[in-house]
UniProtKB/Swiss-Prot annotation:
Organismal lineage: Bacteria, Bacillati, Cyanobacteriota, Cyanophyceae, Synechococcales
Biological function: Catalyzes the initial step of the lipid cycle reactions in the biosynthesis of the cell wall peptidoglycan: transfers peptidoglycan precursor phospho-MurNAc-pentapeptide from UDP-MurNAc-pentapeptide onto the lipid carrier undecaprenyl phosphate, yielding undecaprenyl-pyrophosphoryl-MurNAc-pentapeptide, known as lipid I.
HAMAP family to which the protein is assigned, alphabetical: MraY (MF_00038)
CDD domains cross-referenced by the UniProt entry: GT_MraY (cd06852)
EC number from the UniProt entry: 2.7.8.13
A GO biological-process term: regulation of cell shape
Cofactor: Mg(2+)
Pathway: Cell wall biogenesis; peptidoglycan biosynthesis
Chief location of this protein within or outside the cell: membrane
Native organism: Prochlorococcus marinus (strain MIT 9312)
An example Gene Ontology molecular-function term: UDP-N-acetylmuramoyl-L-alanyl-D-glutamyl-meso-2,6-diaminopimelyl-D-alanyl-D-alanine:undecaprenyl-phosphate transferase activity
Keyword Membrane included in the entry's annotation: yes
UniProt name for this protein: Phospho-N-acetylmuramoyl-pentapeptide-transferase
Short name of one Pfam family: MraY_sig1
GO cellular component labels: plasma membrane
Amino acid sequence: MIGKIKKFNFKSLLILNTFALIATSYLFNNFIFIGVYTLFFFISLFTTKNGIKIIKKLNLLQNIRTEGPANHLKKSDTPTMGGVFMVIPFLIFLLIININLGSLKLFLLLLTIFGFFITGFVDDFLSIKKEQNTGLKTKEKFFLQSIIAIIFIFLAYEKDLINPLITVSDSWQINMNIFTLPISFLVLVGISNSVNLTDGLDGLAAGCSGIVFYGLGTEILMKEQQELIIFSILCYSMSGICLGFLKYNSYPAKIFMGDTGSLSIGAILGSIALLTNSVFTLSIFSGIFIIESLSVMIQVGVFKITKKLFHNGKRIFLMAPLHHHFELKGVKEQKIVENFWKINILLVILGIVLKINL
């Protein structure tokens, strides 16, 4: 049915996601889920709309890399660092909850998200200051992410907050054993960077993130563990935030989230998945993010190998990440984004169906 919809835009996604939240709230007999989603959707609308004015006054505008698709040059001077207006309301909400509950899990989550948020903020700020598309060097950014991730993982593992068993179903669990720490690192840093790589077309990362947060929140609810319900509430609040931001980020974008937003969103997804033992289903829900990231690794890997062997590097894609390949193939930006959204919705449905039937 989704595939037959000719125009699947922001309004279509908003209606579908909201309907799904209403249905979920009804099925689980708890309307706080649709309530928190709706509240943060409107908070995000307000903060983003006013944030655009603030960013323009501060002259915090996007620099576009010249080696990218030519049609992206018109995006230059679009306000960026919009992630500030997505993440700060969420961090305040998380801080208030943690003050009331005094949860170590929530405290670690708060510190980790804040760390990735600062990393993204510094990267965006330096990019604007240097008038380039990149701020921190790749190695510098990865180093900062790694330090934050390692601190989170070791503290969580030390306090038995990370389960070494990846739960596929109630009867099927995979024991990570000695690979618990490296896999946890891969999940946290990998998803964070994957969301960052996906954020290359108007509305792509924000829309997909809103969908994934809904899926993750619902999967956590299906565990039927009272102590985990708060994480579903956090996921639904982020789903609302992403869709509120999407109103101004969908084509033609009036604001970009920047690394401030994308790195933080990935960190929220990865850390919540680790703390709730939802890594398996997150890997399905985040299929778009993972494919985008893999396309870059394949492109770079093949180029380096062929250059070493044949002294002439070959490329698999016209450009990576994958969304740029389709752009250079002549597919319109809006159509690429709409199709990726549709695929992401199907992945969330697949993940939930597997959760029910396995």
